A protein has these predicted regions:
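Long, contiguous C-terminal flanking segments immediately downstream of a protein's structured core
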Residues: 5-159
């Protein structure tokens, strides 16, 4: 809940431009009965638009922002069950005592202001925040990774 989705260079035009989650029903191979599925509370998530998105993708994105349970935002793999079987309408009470809840937009701003390796941001932290704000990238992979997807930490300044 309340996640902020910002497309980067690699996924701005991908088919997952406004997907929050794809649910899979257990096939019975995970030490439980076949057909078991989870329950989900999906609300307050926000998708930022991107210039590379088509008009139809922007419409889907607007629909996902208006209703996080729309068919493009919350999918069920192979239509094994309906989304109504998976969604709950109220937050789970376990979150009440242990969480600080912000809107997606406020959480995004908090990450830009405070995320990093330590209280004092180093040059890598600063670069990552700048690239996040601008939707850009500096490095590509050494084994085929493009548009900011790296293949190893040696492709960047390390971490």
């Amino acid at each position: 809940m309340n996640n902020y989705y910002k497309p980067g260079p690699v996924n701005a035009s991908a088919k997952v431009h406004c997907r929050i989650f794809t649910a899979y029903v257990d096939d019975g191979k995970n030490q439980q009965a076949q057909g078991i599925y989870g329950k989900f509370y999906v609300n307050g998530n926000y998708f930022e638009t991107h210039e590379k998105l088509s008009n139809s993708q922007k419409t889907e994105l607007a629909n996902a922002n208006a209703d996080n349970t729309s068919s493009t935002a919350f999918c069920v793999k192979n239509n094994e069950v309906s989304t109504k079987d998976l969604l709950v309408s109220l937050r789970f009470p376990i979150l009440d005592d242990y969480s600080f809840v912000q809107s997606a937009q406020d959480a995004y701003q908090s990450v830009l202001l405070y995320a990093g390796a330590s209280n004092l941001r180093d040059k890598i932290d600063k670069r990552i925040v700048k690239e996040t704000q601008e939707g850009t990238f500096t490095y590509t992979g050494s084994n085929g990774g493009t548009n900011g997807l790296i293949d190893t930490q040696a492709d960047v300044e390390g971490w």
